[in-house]
Amino acid sequence: MSSSVGATLEAIKYTRGSLEILDQLLIPKSFIYEVVDTTEKAFHAIRDMKVRGAPAIAIVAVLTLAVEANQLLQSNDALLADASAIAKLFNEKLDRLAESRPTAVNLFQAVGDFKNKIAQSLETNKTGTEIVQLIIDEAEALMNRDIEENAKISECGSDHIISTNPSSTTLKVLTHCNTGALATMKYGTALGVIRFLQKKNVLEHAFCTETRPYNQGARLTAFELVYEKIPSTLICDSAVSYLFKTKKIDAIIVGADRVCNNGDTANKIGTYHIAVSAKHHGIPFYVAAPFTSIDLTLASGDLITIEERSEKEITHYRNNDERAVVENIGVWNPGFDVTTADLISGFFTDIGVFTPLTCATTGKKYYDLKTQQAEKLKQQ
């Protein structure tokens, strides 16, 4: 383990054969990088939320496979001679990793993609060594794509907000949970947009919610904002509506763990009520996410599986495990909620901005992201 944080904030440190993650449960009190070199370590790091954020979860999962694949190559393990055995081994590892967090679509897409590539390798008579090398190469490619995607999201999102506020150089924005460099390889999604607004000298202030019960906003986003010297204020989750009423907020930007074809969006618990209040107060509400977070196979948010987390996250103090509430009270602790598409002003993605379509007959606003994606790609 190491405890140094460099000039550039990194949640994930990777070189071929080596993977370390910043234990986000300890921030801001401590900065400890933990070695992750087995599937089981990755499973527990993801499940226990030492690493979190949909893109980062997928990246840590596949980079762990890359580390294990590199170990096989370096040891010249006899297993490399058996392509079927190699495929079986890594498919089992992928299945295990998929069990860690049920809501983040990026992880399931990565697992599916890697399984397909392994199957194709067997069909084309690749050797065990070639399959192992493929796993390393594909994992590193996913890591590099995430960096590129975040930069594109941040650029197009900040440009869109500026274009819809053309006379303002004093923008005030709100974000929820943590969607920055700690949730990705670099920049972040929603927090990346805020970073780019600051870089373009149009941001006056960023507000972040504490994000109960795990306090990702208070522990992580507040830390990132201060680290980047962005003017910022932390508020209680329950203060959001009063903030909207008393301060001039120009935009809300959140991330996403899963987006449906119709635009319904699963994100950290508390997102939905922020969107409802934003609609009431006439403030645009944006979702920033890589297009890989959009599950075009899901018609609506009713089909999203919502992770329910331990009641201890609410009933006990995290630092000393002491009970904070009366015994025998019922507890409901969903980790996510679903914001309906009618509350969302637009999606900032790595392939551009998606705003609602208008039905020609009814005038009703709606999203059809599969169709909109196809149209967007035609234009590029």
Curated annotation (Swiss-Prot):
Pathway: Amino-acid biosynthesis; L-methionine biosynthesis via salvage pathway; L-methionine from S-methyl-5-thio-alpha-D-ribose 1-phosphate: step 1/6. It is an enzyme of class 5 (isomerase). It is found in: Cytoplasm; Nucleus. Its main location: cytoplasm. It comes from the Eukaryota. The keyword Transmembrane does not apply. GO terms for biological process: L-methionine salvage from methylthioadenosine. GO terms for molecular function: S-methyl-5-thioribose-1-phosphate isomerase activity. It catalyses: 5-(methylsulfanyl)-alpha-D-ribose 1-phosphate = 5-(methylsulfanyl)-D-ribulose 1-phosphate. InterPro entries: IF-2B-related, IF-M1Pi, IF_2B-like_C, Initiation_fac_2B_a/b/d, M1Pi_N, NagB/RpiA_transferase-like. One of its GO terms (cellular component) is cytoplasm. Keywords: Amino-acid biosynthesis, Cytoplasm, Isomerase, Methionine biosynthesis, Nucleus. PANTHER family: METHYLTHIORIBOSE-1-PHOSPHATE ISOMERASE. Belongs to the eIF-2B alpha/beta/delta subunits family. MtnA subfamily. This is Methylthioribose-1-phosphate isomerase. It comes from Naegleria gruberi (Amoeba).
